[in-house]
Protein backbone atom coordinates (compact mmCIF):
# COMPACT_ATOMS: atom_id res chain seq x y z
CA UNK A 1 0.00 0.00 0.00
CA UNK A 2 1.12 3.56 -0.66
CA UNK A 3 -0.67 4.93 2.42
CA UNK A 4 1.28 5.90 5.53
CA UNK A 5 -1.08 3.95 7.78
CA UNK A 6 0.63 1.26 9.82
CA UNK A 7 -2.35 -0.94 10.59
CA UNK A 8 -4.70 -3.34 8.80
CA UNK A 9 -7.86 -1.87 7.33
CA UNK A 10 -10.96 -3.70 6.12
CA UNK A 11 -13.91 -2.17 4.31
CA UNK A 12 -17.13 -4.18 4.40
CA UNK A 13 -19.69 -3.52 1.67
CA UNK A 14 -23.09 -4.76 2.82
CA UNK A 15 -24.38 -4.59 6.39
CA UNK A 16 -27.09 -7.21 6.16
CA UNK A 17 -27.22 -10.43 8.15
CA UNK A 18 -23.98 -11.81 6.69
CA UNK A 19 -22.11 -8.50 6.77
CA UNK A 20 -23.03 -7.59 10.34
CA UNK A 21 -22.25 -11.12 11.55
CA UNK A 22 -18.86 -10.90 9.82
CA UNK A 23 -18.17 -7.54 11.47
CA UNK A 24 -19.06 -9.06 14.84
CA UNK A 25 -16.68 -11.97 14.16
CA UNK A 26 -13.85 -9.54 13.36
CA UNK A 27 -14.43 -7.70 16.62
CA UNK A 28 -14.65 -10.91 18.67
CA UNK A 29 -11.44 -12.29 17.16
CA UNK A 30 -9.48 -9.04 17.19
CA UNK A 31 -8.92 -9.10 13.42
CA UNK A 32 -7.85 -5.81 11.76
CA UNK A 33 -7.45 -2.46 13.47
CA UNK A 34 -9.85 -0.50 11.27
CA UNK A 35 -13.27 -1.53 9.95
CA UNK A 36 -15.41 0.67 7.73
CA UNK A 37 -18.96 -0.42 6.89
CA UNK A 38 -20.58 0.75 3.64
CA UNK A 39 -24.32 0.56 3.03
CA UNK A 40 -26.68 2.02 0.45
CA UNK A 41 -27.80 5.57 1.38
CA UNK A 42 -31.21 4.52 2.71
CA UNK A 43 -29.52 2.06 5.09
CA UNK A 44 -26.59 4.29 6.09
CA UNK A 45 -28.02 4.86 9.57
CA UNK A 46 -28.07 1.10 10.17
CA UNK A 47 -24.34 1.04 9.41
CA UNK A 48 -23.87 3.93 11.85
CA UNK A 49 -25.81 2.02 14.49
CA UNK A 50 -23.92 -1.22 13.94
CA UNK A 51 -20.57 0.57 14.11
CA UNK A 52 -21.58 2.16 17.41
CA UNK A 53 -22.92 -1.11 18.80
CA UNK A 54 -19.78 -3.01 17.78
CA UNK A 55 -17.54 -0.34 19.29
CA UNK A 56 -19.08 -1.05 22.69
CA UNK A 57 -17.50 -4.52 22.60
CA UNK A 58 -13.96 -3.21 22.09
CA UNK A 59 -13.15 -2.89 25.79
CA UNK A 60 -13.59 -6.67 26.00
CA UNK A 61 -11.55 -7.52 22.89
CA UNK A 62 -8.92 -5.30 21.27
CA UNK A 63 -8.68 -1.75 19.90
CA UNK A 64 -10.31 -1.09 16.56
CA UNK A 65 -11.62 1.95 14.72
CA UNK A 66 -15.16 1.14 13.51
CA UNK A 67 -17.33 3.51 11.50
CA UNK A 68 -19.94 3.84 8.75
CA UNK A 69 -17.82 4.37 5.64
CA UNK A 70 -18.05 5.84 2.15
CA UNK A 71 -16.54 4.38 -1.02
CA UNK A 72 -13.75 6.97 -0.82
CA UNK A 73 -12.58 5.20 2.35
CA UNK A 74 -11.58 2.18 0.24
CA UNK A 75 -8.56 4.02 -1.16
CA UNK A 76 -6.06 2.78 1.44
CA UNK A 77 -7.87 -0.38 2.55
CA UNK A 78 -6.02 -3.68 2.58
CA UNK A 79 -9.18 -5.68 1.97
CA UNK A 80 -12.66 -4.95 0.61
CA UNK A 81 -15.21 -7.60 1.54
CA UNK A 82 -18.40 -7.74 -0.52
CA UNK A 83 -21.42 -9.31 1.16
CA UNK A 84 -24.01 -6.98 -0.40
CA UNK A 85 -26.62 -8.54 -2.62
CA UNK A 86 -30.19 -9.74 -2.82
CA UNK A 87 -30.67 -12.54 -0.28
CA UNK A 88 -31.51 -16.09 -1.26
CA UNK A 89 -35.19 -16.79 -0.62
CA UNK A 90 -36.86 -20.12 0.16
CA UNK A 91 -37.06 -22.15 -3.04
CA UNK A 92 -34.35 -20.12 -4.80
CA UNK A 93 -31.00 -21.55 -5.84
CA UNK A 94 -27.89 -19.43 -5.57
CA UNK A 95 -27.77 -19.26 -9.36
CA UNK A 96 -31.30 -17.80 -9.43
CA UNK A 97 -29.76 -14.69 -7.89
CA UNK A 98 -27.47 -13.99 -10.85
CA UNK A 99 -29.41 -11.25 -12.62
CA UNK A 100 -30.13 -9.20 -9.50
CA UNK A 101 -26.72 -9.51 -7.94
CA UNK A 102 -24.55 -8.95 -11.02
CA UNK A 103 -25.99 -5.45 -11.37
CA UNK A 104 -25.37 -4.76 -7.68
CA UNK A 105 -21.84 -6.16 -7.96
CA UNK A 106 -21.01 -3.99 -10.97
CA UNK A 107 -22.03 -0.84 -9.10
CA UNK A 108 -20.03 -1.77 -6.01
CA UNK A 109 -16.84 -2.81 -7.79
CA UNK A 110 -16.85 0.26 -10.03
CA UNK A 111 -17.06 2.61 -7.05
CA UNK A 112 -14.41 0.73 -5.06
CA UNK A 113 -11.94 0.86 -7.96
CA UNK A 114 -12.67 4.55 -8.59
CA UNK A 115 -11.55 5.27 -5.01
CA UNK A 116 -8.01 4.21 -5.93
CA UNK A 117 -8.23 0.91 -4.05
CA UNK A 118 -5.15 -1.31 -4.58
CA UNK A 119 -5.81 -4.11 -2.14
CA UNK A 120 -7.61 -7.45 -2.32
CA UNK A 121 -11.27 -8.18 -3.00
CA UNK A 122 -12.98 -10.89 -0.95
CA UNK A 123 -16.42 -11.81 -2.29
CA UNK A 124 -19.15 -13.63 -0.35
CA UNK A 125 -22.38 -12.53 -2.06
CA UNK A 126 -24.13 -15.31 -3.98
CA UNK A 127 -23.77 -16.92 -6.40
CA UNK A 128 -20.24 -16.44 -5.11
CA UNK A 129 -18.30 -18.11 -7.95
CA UNK A 130 -20.09 -16.01 -10.58
CA UNK A 131 -19.75 -12.80 -8.55
CA UNK A 132 -16.07 -13.45 -7.95
CA UNK A 133 -15.69 -13.74 -11.72
CA UNK A 134 -17.64 -10.50 -12.25
CA UNK A 135 -15.56 -8.70 -9.60
CA UNK A 136 -12.45 -9.73 -11.52
CA UNK A 137 -13.96 -8.62 -14.83
CA UNK A 138 -15.29 -5.28 -13.59
CA UNK A 139 -12.21 -4.39 -11.52
CA UNK A 140 -9.46 -5.20 -13.99
CA UNK A 141 -7.49 -6.57 -11.02
CA UNK A 142 -5.06 -9.49 -11.30
CA UNK A 143 -6.82 -12.79 -10.64
CA UNK A 144 -4.69 -13.36 -7.53
CA UNK A 145 -6.24 -10.30 -5.84
CA UNK A 146 -9.85 -11.35 -6.37
CA UNK A 147 -10.95 -14.13 -4.02
CA UNK A 148 -14.31 -15.73 -3.38
CA UNK A 149 -15.31 -17.52 -0.20
CA UNK A 150 -15.84 -20.54 -2.45
CA UNK A 151 -16.39 -23.84 -0.68
CA UNK A 152 -14.88 -22.72 2.63
CA UNK A 153 -18.22 -22.96 4.42
CA UNK A 154 -19.22 -26.15 2.59
CA UNK A 155 -15.94 -27.78 3.60
CA UNK A 156 -16.47 -26.71 7.21
CA UNK A 157 -19.96 -28.21 7.13
CA UNK A 158 -18.52 -31.41 5.67
CA UNK A 159 -15.84 -31.65 8.36
CA UNK A 160 -18.39 -31.02 11.11
CA UNK A 161 -20.81 -33.62 9.71
CA UNK A 162 -18.04 -36.22 9.51
CA UNK A 163 -16.87 -35.27 13.00
CA UNK A 164 -20.35 -35.85 14.41
CA UNK A 165 -20.67 -39.16 12.57
CA UNK A 166 -17.26 -40.38 13.79
CA UNK A 167 -17.34 -38.73 17.24
CA UNK A 168 -14.08 -36.83 16.77
CA UNK A 169 -13.11 -33.16 16.85
CA UNK A 170 -13.88 -31.44 13.53
CA UNK A 171 -10.42 -29.87 13.66
CA UNK A 172 -8.95 -33.35 13.25
CA UNK A 173 -11.03 -34.02 10.13
CA UNK A 174 -9.33 -33.04 6.88
CA UNK A 175 -11.77 -33.08 3.98
CA UNK A 176 -12.82 -30.76 1.18
CA UNK A 177 -15.87 -29.86 -0.81
CA UNK A 178 -14.89 -28.61 -4.27
CA UNK A 179 -16.67 -27.12 -7.27
CA UNK A 180 -19.44 -24.55 -7.27
CA UNK A 181 -20.62 -23.21 -3.92
CA UNK A 182 -24.02 -24.66 -4.67
CA UNK A 183 -25.93 -27.58 -6.09
CA UNK A 184 -23.15 -29.00 -8.28
CA UNK A 185 -20.51 -29.12 -5.54
CA UNK A 186 -18.97 -32.48 -4.64
CA UNK A 187 -17.11 -34.16 -1.81
CA UNK A 188 -13.49 -35.17 -2.33
CA UNK A 189 -13.90 -38.55 -0.65
CA UNK A 190 -10.64 -39.85 -2.13
CA UNK A 191 -8.57 -37.57 0.11
CA UNK A 192 -10.73 -37.29 3.22
CA UNK A 193 -8.75 -38.30 6.29
CA UNK A 194 -8.83 -38.26 10.06
CA UNK A 195 -5.50 -37.11 11.47
CA UNK A 196 -3.76 -38.45 8.38
CA UNK A 197 -5.62 -41.77 8.29
CA UNK A 198 -7.60 -42.26 5.08
CA UNK A 199 -11.32 -42.11 5.84
CA UNK A 200 -11.97 -45.56 4.41
CA UNK A 201 -9.27 -47.08 6.62
CA UNK A 202 -10.45 -45.11 9.64
CA UNK A 203 -13.98 -46.45 9.19
CA UNK A 204 -12.70 -50.03 9.04
CA UNK A 205 -10.89 -49.65 12.34
CA UNK A 206 -13.54 -47.79 14.28
CA UNK A 207 -17.10 -48.49 13.27
CA UNK A 208 -19.39 -49.82 10.61
CA UNK A 209 -20.67 -46.89 8.54
CA UNK A 210 -22.49 -47.81 5.35
CA UNK A 211 -21.92 -46.06 2.03
CA UNK A 212 -25.56 -44.96 1.98
CA UNK A 213 -24.97 -43.10 5.24
CA UNK A 214 -22.03 -41.22 3.73
CA UNK A 215 -24.07 -40.29 0.66
CA UNK A 216 -26.83 -39.00 2.93
CA UNK A 217 -24.24 -37.11 4.97
CA UNK A 218 -22.93 -35.33 1.87
CA UNK A 219 -26.44 -34.50 0.68
CA UNK A 220 -27.10 -32.90 4.05
CA UNK A 221 -23.96 -30.80 3.63
CA UNK A 222 -24.85 -29.80 0.08
CA UNK A 223 -28.40 -28.86 1.02
CA UNK A 224 -27.60 -27.29 4.40
CA UNK A 225 -28.31 -23.75 3.21
CA UNK A 226 -31.78 -24.72 2.02
CA UNK A 227 -32.49 -26.40 5.35
CA UNK A 228 -31.42 -23.34 7.31
CA UNK A 229 -33.20 -20.87 5.01
CA UNK A 230 -36.44 -22.81 5.32
CA UNK A 231 -36.16 -22.79 9.12
CA UNK A 232 -34.85 -19.29 9.88
CA UNK A 233 -34.83 -17.34 6.62
CA UNK A 234 -31.09 -16.98 5.99
CA UNK A 235 -27.62 -18.35 6.74
CA UNK A 236 -25.07 -15.98 8.22
CA UNK A 237 -23.15 -17.22 11.26
CA UNK A 238 -21.18 -19.96 9.51
CA UNK A 239 -20.22 -17.87 6.49
CA UNK A 240 -19.32 -14.93 8.75
CA UNK A 241 -16.77 -17.00 10.65
CA UNK A 242 -15.47 -18.51 7.39
CA UNK A 243 -14.93 -14.98 6.06
CA UNK A 244 -13.17 -13.98 9.27
CA UNK A 245 -10.84 -16.96 8.87
CA UNK A 246 -10.01 -15.96 5.28
CA UNK A 247 -9.52 -12.35 6.37
CA UNK A 248 -7.05 -13.36 9.07
CA UNK A 249 -5.10 -15.49 6.59
CA UNK A 250 -4.77 -12.50 4.26
CA UNK A 251 -4.02 -9.77 6.81
CA UNK A 252 -1.55 -11.92 8.77
CA UNK A 253 0.12 -13.24 5.59
CA UNK A 254 -0.38 -16.81 6.78
CA UNK A 255 0.01 -18.67 3.48
CA UNK A 256 -2.84 -20.82 4.75
CA UNK A 257 -4.45 -23.47 2.57
CA UNK A 258 -8.18 -22.76 2.35
CA UNK A 259 -10.92 -23.83 -0.10
CA UNK A 260 -11.74 -20.67 -2.06
CA UNK A 261 -13.13 -19.50 -5.39
CA UNK A 262 -9.97 -19.69 -7.49
CA UNK A 263 -9.41 -18.81 -11.15
CA UNK A 264 -8.90 -21.92 -13.24
CA UNK A 265 -6.12 -22.06 -15.83
CA UNK A 266 -6.39 -25.64 -17.02
CA UNK A 267 -6.28 -27.52 -13.72
CA UNK A 268 -8.77 -30.40 -13.87
CA UNK A 269 -9.41 -29.51 -17.51
CA UNK A 270 -11.19 -26.30 -16.49
CA UNK A 271 -10.44 -22.76 -17.67
CA UNK A 272 -11.66 -19.18 -17.27
CA UNK A 273 -13.99 -19.63 -14.29
CA UNK A 274 -13.61 -19.07 -10.57
CA UNK A 275 -14.56 -22.22 -8.70
CA UNK A 276 -14.00 -23.82 -5.30
CA UNK A 277 -10.68 -25.56 -4.69
CA UNK A 278 -7.96 -25.37 -2.04
CA UNK A 279 -5.39 -22.61 -2.48
CA UNK A 280 -2.53 -20.99 -0.59
CA UNK A 281 -3.62 -17.50 0.47
CA UNK A 282 -1.66 -14.69 2.10
CA UNK A 283 -1.03 -10.95 2.05
CA UNK A 284 -0.80 -10.82 -1.75
CA UNK A 285 -3.95 -12.85 -2.27
CA UNK A 286 -3.90 -16.26 -3.92
CA UNK A 287 -0.30 -17.48 -3.92
CA UNK A 288 -1.07 -20.67 -5.83
CA UNK A 289 -3.82 -23.25 -6.17
CA UNK A 290 -3.36 -26.58 -4.42
CA UNK A 291 -4.32 -29.11 -7.05
CA UNK A 292 -5.52 -32.17 -5.16
CA UNK A 293 -5.09 -35.21 -7.45
CA UNK A 294 -8.76 -36.07 -7.94
CA UNK A 295 -9.87 -39.48 -9.13
CA UNK A 296 -11.67 -39.79 -12.47
CA UNK A 297 -15.17 -39.50 -11.02
CA UNK A 298 -14.24 -36.41 -9.00
CA UNK A 299 -12.55 -34.80 -12.01
CA UNK A 300 -15.72 -35.32 -14.03
CA UNK A 301 -17.76 -33.69 -11.27
CA UNK A 302 -15.37 -30.71 -11.22
CA UNK A 303 -15.71 -30.30 -14.97
CA UNK A 304 -19.50 -30.63 -14.83
CA UNK A 305 -19.70 -28.03 -12.06
CA UNK A 306 -17.49 -25.63 -14.01
CA UNK A 307 -19.60 -26.18 -17.12
CA UNK A 308 -22.70 -25.07 -15.22
CA UNK A 309 -20.96 -21.92 -14.03
CA UNK A 310 -19.60 -21.20 -17.51
CA UNK A 311 -23.10 -21.44 -18.99
CA UNK A 312 -24.42 -18.92 -16.44
CA UNK A 313 -21.52 -16.55 -17.14
CA UNK A 314 -21.90 -16.84 -20.91
CA UNK A 315 -25.61 -16.07 -20.68
CA UNK A 316 -25.06 -13.12 -18.33
CA UNK A 317 -22.34 -11.60 -20.50
CA UNK A 318 -24.72 -11.32 -23.42
CA UNK A 319 -25.79 -8.15 -21.60
CA UNK A 320 -24.00 -5.25 -23.39
CA UNK A 321 -23.81 -3.36 -20.09
CA UNK A 322 -21.64 -6.07 -18.57
CA UNK A 323 -19.54 -6.39 -21.72
CA UNK A 324 -18.79 -2.67 -21.74
CA UNK A 325 -17.90 -2.65 -18.04
CA UNK A 326 -15.43 -5.54 -18.34
CA UNK A 327 -11.74 -4.70 -17.90
CA UNK A 328 -10.35 -8.25 -17.93
Swiss-Prot record:
Locations listed in the record: Cytoplasm
PROSITE patterns: L_LDH
GO biological process: glycolytic process; lactate metabolic process
Residues the entry annotates as binding beta-D-fructose 1,6-bisphosphate: 159, 174
Regulation acting on activity, per entry: Allosterically activated by fructose 1,6-bisphosphate (FBP).
An example Gene Ontology CC term for this record: cytoplasm
Pfam family, one: Ldh_1_C
PTM-bearing positions, type Phosphotyrosine: 226
Main location group: cytoplasm
Binding site for NAD(+): 18, 39, 46, 71, 85-86, 107, 124-126, 149
Domain of life: Bacteria
PANTHER family xrefs: L-2-HYDROXYCARBOXYLATE DEHYDROGENASE (NAD(P)(+)) (PTHR43128), L-LACTATE DEHYDROGENASE (PTHR43128:SF16)
Record note on quaternary structure: Homotetramer.
Functional note: Catalyzes the conversion of lactate to pyruvate.
Name of this protein: L-lactate dehydrogenase
Species the sequence originates in: Streptococcus pneumoniae (strain 70585)
Lineage: Bacteria, Bacillati, Bacillota, Bacilli, Lactobacillales
Gene: ldh
Amino acid sequence: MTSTKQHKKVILVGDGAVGSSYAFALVNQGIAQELGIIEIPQLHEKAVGDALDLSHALAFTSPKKIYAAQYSDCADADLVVITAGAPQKPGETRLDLVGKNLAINKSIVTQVVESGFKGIFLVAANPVDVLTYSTWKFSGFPKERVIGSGTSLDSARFRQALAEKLDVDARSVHAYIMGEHGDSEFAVWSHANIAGVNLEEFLKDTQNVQEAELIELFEGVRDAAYTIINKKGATYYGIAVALARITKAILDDENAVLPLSVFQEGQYGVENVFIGQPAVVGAHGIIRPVNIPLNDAETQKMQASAKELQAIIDEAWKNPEFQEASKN
